[in-house]
Amino acid sequence: MATLPLPTQTSTISLPKPYLSNSFSFPLRNATLSTTTNRRNFLTTGRIIARAYKVVVEHDGKTTELEVEPDETILSKALDSGLDVPYDCNLGVCMTCPAKLVTGTVDQSGGMLSDDVVERGYTLLCASYPTSDCHIKMIPEEELLSLQLATAND
């Protein structure tokens, strides 16, 4: 079996005609293409293997390390792991699950935070998909609400 690293953006893979009849394109976050070939080195199967990111969450004086898949939110993994983190709408709207991104990056394009607030490193766990290993610190809801309202009035 061969494993090929792929870029972290939409990729197109083209293989010569003996291997595959056409090319295909798909979005990737943190993945490799794993293929199996037969005795004549013809491609017989292919699958995408995504690597989970290490996300460290600080909450209630404790630090917890999570392995979060690229297609799951940090909130869903935190809840599955037994962390008692606040949340409500699970849609990135109510601002009940705020956090400060200490290191790393997340895709939170589905959340409703203003660009100014996002640029300052704030995130909503329910709308955050890791795009790298991260360190996140839970913050009081009031801290994010006051910042979001202040930037809305600018």
Swiss-Prot record:
It is found in: Plastid, Chloroplast. It comes from the Eukaryota. Residues 1-56 form a transit peptide. Induction: Induced by high light at protein level, but not at transcript level. Strongly up-regulated in response to acceptor limitation at photosystem I (PSI) in plants lacking of photosynthetic [2Fe-2S] ferredoxin (Fd). InterPro entries: 2Fe-2S_ferredoxin-like_sf (IPR036010), 2Fe-2S_ferredoxin-type (IPR001041), Beta-grasp_dom_sf (IPR012675), Fd_pln (IPR010241). One of its GO terms (cellular component) is chloroplast. Its main location: plastid. Belongs to the 2Fe2S plant-type ferredoxin family. Ferredoxins are iron-sulfur proteins that transfer electrons in a wide variety of metabolic reactions. Mediates alternative electron partitioning in conditions of acceptor limitation at photosystem I. Accepts electrons from photosystem I (PSI) and is capable of electron transfer with FNR, but cannot support photoreduction of NADP(+). This is Ferredoxin C 1, chloroplastic. The gene is FDC1.
